[in-house]
Every structure is written in structure tokens, then in C-alpha cells.
Amino acid sequence: MAAVKTLNPKAEVARAQAALAVNISAARGLQDVLRTNLGPKGTMKMLVSGAGDIKLTKDGNVLLHEMQIQHPTASLIAKVATAQDDITGDGTTSNVLIIGELLKQADLYISEGLHPRIITEGFEAAKEKALQFLEEVKVSREMDRETLIDVARTSLRTKVHAELADVLTEAVVDSILAIKKQDEPIDLFMIEIMEMKHKSETDTSLIRGLVLDHGARHPDMKKRVEDAYILTCNVSLEYEKTEVNSGFFYKSAEEREKLVKAERKFIEDRVKKIIELKRKVCGDSDKGFVVINQKGIDPFSLDALSKEGIVALRRAKRRNMERLTLACGGVALNSFDDLSPDQLGHAGLVYEYTLGEEKFTFIEKCNNPRSVTLLIKGPNKHTLTQIKDAVRDGLRAVRNAIDDGCVVPGAGAVEVAMAEALIKHKPSVKGRAQLGVQAFADALLIIPKVLAQNSGFDLQETLVKIQAEHSESGQLVGVDLNTGEPMVAAEVGVWDNYCVKKQLLHSCTVIATNILLVDEIMRAGMSSLKG
């Protein structure tokens, strides 16, 4: 009888073989759910929430976040996989598949009496060799637009259908290249992802500027201005209460009038400063003038600005204020005390677009914008969500490639070559730990196997062909998902991120090792025993 039982009769305990069986079945269960998602030919999953909302996705990260996973071990694996996505932006499904397969291969040896500790030693030896092999096969190259397009396409085609992936690929790469600065980390927050329920998903485009999800608040303001000066400010153009708690008292109607006039004059002086600046920079030309304010603008001020032909937008979102100055230039002002023309930004075109009851303001044709907008279009909500998730992963894949300065061949090529390298390395490992290395090598082959299976080909036949081709040619050969034949991934331009593969090897080995070394599961916590 378990020691914990004597202390706590209500505790539930699973020991030795039973504990291992529970853990391995959980890992395999999760693997079976995500197995069909892998790769460009993977199938979709439909998630229906309690409220009846539908989400169509084949992104492993979205699935693991949205699914309600009850089993503690499966939940642990799901958290590791989603952490992989948070760090690198890809590899979630591969993570779950490899952990499941490592446990499955280990189970074969454990059922024959091998101790889990020996297998885990083999796993560690295999991981060291695999990481060393990854260093050898990585391709260091200049990250030009063409290479980045290949990287983005490889990532995006696993999330959305090929035609849409090709449209998104160029937009994603161009947006990163627009905001990239020499010797500085890439800040993906400088790429605004704006949704518009309109037209079809292939109309998604890159706007070299900014799109704001609101319009001007005055009916007489221009809907379109060209060659416009942009004044970005965070100054109240409406009467506001004082920040400290204060009161004003008047004895007569005349005094009240004076108070109202003083309040009004305070705002009017600010508006006059804007109008004077506009006259100074525009003169009699047709140039436009746009004021974008984070705080409010009252109807009187809007009226005065409108009469001068100034387009004014109020209550702009805070996150857009930084992007505005990066896209258009200029300075975001907190006071109008010393307004000067060199504080203004510039945009070639500013126009308002009305879609149903929603209004959008486009600020385009900026000179060298350091902040851009990806405008996602789609006919319905779940298409927009799916594209948004795909774009986020695509952006991170491109950023990773630039940060790493290298890529590795995809389509299962690295895994096949790595498995062969591990089998050659096996004799140099002492004793029974060799079996752990063998299990690790076999587990890695799950990736090319599942890629072939999801494309409708015989997985054993495809794998044998690829291994034979790799042995003969010595090149990194992957699966051609259209024909099921071997292909040299590097020649076709199928590239994966180096940091994703590296993280994958680390996290899968650690979690599989920890799960294998669990020999007792105790359900004896306070909360689990209530009732």
C-alpha cells in the first residue's frame, strides 16, 4: 500500500507501470488530435465554443489554447507546445508529435524491462548529437527578399490554403523589410494588423502607412486630401474639468458669462494656433492639413477647423500615436506653446473610407514609413481570425530568419538526415543507452511520416524512398507533398527556422524525459479531494 494512503485514505495513486501507462496514453491521445494538422496538406479542425461560436483552424497553437484539456499530463504537453509558439512562433504541432512519439518508442523498450533512466540517458546523448548535427546543416545566407519570401511561404502554407498564402507572403515580407532598421531588433508592434469585413481574403494588402478605424466627426470636412501635412497631438480641444478637485462660484449672470467666455477662449486660442500654422505651411496651395488628436475636439473647434479646410480626427488610439510619427514623421505634441512646421509629418494621401456604419481613415504614400499596416480582408469573422493567426506566425518566421541569419531545409529533410546521423552515432554511445538513441532517431521520423500521410501517400513507402535517396545523394531530401517523391528541399525553397528546430529538440527531450521518470502519480492535493 502506498505510503500516502496511510496518511490520506482518500488519495488516488497510480504507481510504476500504471503511472507510465497513464502518461503515455495522454501524450498519444494529444498526438492523435494534432496529427492530421501537420503541414500544408493538413486538415482543418472546427472548434465550437459553449456559446456556439465556430473557429476553423489548423494552427496547433490556436487549437491547444482553445481546447479544454482535462488530463494533467496532456495539459503539461500543451503548455510546452504553446510556450514554443510564444518563443518562436512555430513548431507547436511538431512539438506535440515528437513528444508523443518519443514516449511511444520508449514504451516499447520499457515493456521489455529496460529502466526508464537508461532511456533518458540515451535521449540526452541523442539530443547533444542532434543539436551538433543541426549546427552542421544550417544554411547561413544573406537574408534577401527572395529567401525571406521562401521562409514566409513555408510557414504560411501550413496555416492557410496555398493561393491565400502566396498573397500573404509578399505582404508579410515587405512589411518586415519596411520597419527593419540596421543593427536594431525588429519590433513587430510597429506592424498594425487591421481587420476589415469586406471583399474576399485574397484582397488582403500591405498599406505603407496607417489605417485608423474611425473617421472625421464633422459632416463638412474633406473626405480626401492629397500631399497633406500631419499634426499629431495629445492636447485637449474641448472644455475639461480640472484634474484637482476645484470649484468656481459666481454671484451674477454677468460673471457666469465671463466664466463661459474664458473657458471658450482657452480652447479657441489653441484652435487659432493650429489654423495659423496651417496658413503658414500651406499658404494658397492645394496642400492638405490633417490633425490627429488623442484627446477630444468639441463641435465648435471642429467647425472652426472645417471652415479652414483642415481634417481633424479625435480620440485616436494611444498605440497609433507612436506609429503615426514613425509612419509620417513629425513629433507627437503635448502642448501648442511653440508650434513650428518642422514638428509636422507628411503623407501623400489621406482619405476616409466608409463601410456600412464603420469608417476607416487611410494615411498612405508616406516617405520611408517605419510603421506599416497589414489590412486583412475577409467575408466573415472566422476567416479574418484564421488569417490574423497565420499572419502573426508568418511575421515571426521572417523575424526569426533575420535574427538567426540562417535557415534549415524543411519538408522533413532535417529530421530524416538527423535520424540517420544518430543511428551512425549510436555505436559510440556506451551500453544500453544506445537503445535511447535508437528510440530518439525513430521518433524524429514521425515528421516526414505524418507529412506524407496527410498528403494521401503511403507513409512507409515514402519514408523508405526518402531515406534511400538521402543515403545515395548525401543531400538533405524531404517529401514533395504533391507527388510523394523525394525532393531536395533547399532547391525548391522550402525553409524552416533554425531557432524553431533548436527549441524543438530542447523542449521535447526535457518533457519526454520528465514524463518517463514519473513513477507515481498522487492525486492528494486539497482541492482535488473536496466532496
Curated annotation (Swiss-Prot):
Which GO MF terms does the UniProt record name? ATP binding; ATP hydrolysis activity; ATP-dependent protein folding chaperone; unfolded protein binding
Choose one Gene Ontology CC annotation of this protein and give it. chaperonin-containing T-complex
Cited CDD domains: TCP1_zeta (cd03342)
Specify where it is mainly localized: cytoplasm
Q: What is its EC number?
A: 3.6.1.-
InterPro entries, from UniProt?
A: Chap_CCT_zeta, Chaperone_TCP-1, Chaperonin_TCP-1_CS, Cpn60/GroEL/TCP-1, GroEL-like_apical_dom_sf, GROEL-like_equatorial_sf, TCP-1-like_intermed_sf, TCP-1_chaperonin
Transmembrane portions of the chain: none
Q: Which domain of life is it from?
A: Eukaryota
Q: Where is this cross-link: Glycyl lysine isopeptide (Lys-Gly) (interchain with G-Cter in SUMO2)?
A: 251
Q: List the disulfide bonds.
A: none
Q: Which residues bind ADP?
A: 39, 91-94, 158-159, 411, 496
Residue numbers carrying N6-acetyllysine: 5, 199, 287, 365, 377, 388
- What is any Pfam family matched here? Cpn60_TCP1
Which residues of this UniProt protein bind ATP? 39, 91-93, 411-412, 496, 501
The protein's matches in PANTHER family, at most eight in alphabetical order, are given as: CHAPERONIN
Q: Which family does the UniProt entry place this protein in?
A: Belongs to the TCP-1 chaperonin family.
Q: How does it assemble?
A: Component of the chaperonin-containing T-complex (TRiC), a hexadecamer composed of two identical back-to-back stacked rings enclosing a protein folding chamber. Each ring is made up of eight different subunits: TCP1/CCT1, CCT2, CCT3, CCT4, CCT5, CCT6A/CCT6, CCT7, CCT8. Interacts with PACRG.
The protein depicted here goes by the name T-complex protein 1 subunit zeta
Q: Which organism is it from?
A: Pongo abelii (Sumatran orangutan)
Lineage of the species this protein comes from: Eukaryota, Metazoa, Chordata, Craniata, Vertebrata
